[in-house]
Amino acid sequence: MEMNKKTIFVTGATSGVGLKITELLVAQGHIVYATGRNEVALKTLQRLGANVIQADLTSLTAIDKVCAQLPALDVAIFSAGVGKFAIAPMLTDEDITQMVELNIRVPIYLAKRIATKMIAREQGQLIFIGSQAGKVATPKASVYAATKHAIVGFTNGLRMELAPYNIKVTAIHPGPIDTPFLDKVNDESGYRESLGRLLLTPEEVAQATVKTIERPVREVNLPRMMGWTSKLYALAPATIEFLAKPLFNKK
């Protein structure tokens, strides 16, 4: 059965998961508005059929300009994000600011503006690309995990706030993904290889995300085993930290 054509906005559309989501949506015939910083990637998406908007979303002025260019939306997918991996004392203030800006403030500012218009229409869906780091923090990712914990809290509260207006809120929480994002992790310890089947492809995450448009759900945990691990972590954090310490410390 073909998916009904929808008008969809995607952030972080020029790389990684956001790029694959955008390509998949365009291929399915949806009307897609894609934003990102990479001008070359945006031109490629434009040739595929996407409506592109180049912007640095860490600026409130830019956020307002982008929102002013958007039509009535059926779905908004917030995929833009950044990670800097080191123990917290070794991160620069700029590293921390960048993660807080792009991973927390940007999706919240955008969701506020887009949800306001969806409320008036009493329909819509907001999809946030979170992370398993929002469920289970690990060494060298404490600040990154904090930003993703914020998204877990925000989506859980927002879901209840928007339910009376027939607006769905979905959170996608993937584990490690085989993208340039992962290259920022020190790989001398063999972290990438140690992940084995836990390592996701951008295509897998994109397909799981797009699937929730037709069948909205509360959240998606990828891979499934990590979803179960996060549930066990909530019950016995010290035990999970002890058992998973060898893997955690490879990062």
Segments predicted by a language model, with ranges:
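Active-site helix of classical SDR
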Residues: 111, 147
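SDR active-site lid
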Residues: 164-224
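Conserved NAD(P)H cofactor-binding loop of Rossmann-fold oxidoreductase domains
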Residues: 80-84
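Substrate-binding pocket helix/loop in short-chain dehydrogenase/reductase
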Residues: 87-88, 92-100
